[in-house]
Amino acid sequence: MVKLAFPRELRLLTPTHFTFVFQQPQRAGTPQITILGRLNQLGHPRIGLTVAKKHVKRAHERNRIKRLTRESFRLRQHELPAMDFVVVAKKGIADLDNRALTEALEKLWRRHCRQAPAS
């Protein structure tokens, strides 16, 4: 049985990890959300989240966006390539309902799977 946990090893934790992705990213995006990705040598994907207070004013909305993004990643982690991902929320993301946000994330994960070089 496949484990769908979200342990610490699957998260980008330090500014160095984020900087690594920002240097040479592969981009996939919609008007409300962008996912940056860069291949890593770890053999598994990792995720980092940036939801700026400038774009999403209320804390409960920022938390909802982060929660749904983590859940989407957790469920697809075994299908994703070994890349470090940074999810960047943009203006207007708070207007998306849960279903629309989940569908947008699924579309972007599929796009990253297609863009990733075959290993």
Swiss-Prot record:
Gene Ontology CC: ribonuclease P complex
GO biological process, one term: tRNA 5'-leader removal
Leading EC class: hydrolase
Domain of life, source organism: Bacteria
GO MF terms, alphabetically ordered: 3'-tRNA processing endoribonuclease activity; ribonuclease P activity; tRNA binding
Matching Pfam families: Ribonuclease_P (PF00825)
RNA-binding in keyword set: yes
Catalytic function, reaction form: Endonucleolytic cleavage of RNA, removing 5'-extranucleotides from tRNA precursor
Alphabetized UniProt keyword annotations: Endonuclease, Hydrolase, Nuclease, RNA-binding, tRNA processing
EC number: 3.1.26.5
Subunit structure: Consists of a catalytic RNA component (M1 or rnpB) and a protein subunit.
Function: RNaseP catalyzes the removal of the 5'-leader sequence from pre-tRNA to produce the mature 5'-terminus. It can also cleave other RNA substrates such as 4.5S RNA. The protein component plays an auxiliary but essential role in vivo by binding to the 5'-leader sequence and broadening the substrate specificity of the ribozyme.
Family note: Belongs to the RnpA family.
Official protein name in the record: Ribonuclease P protein component
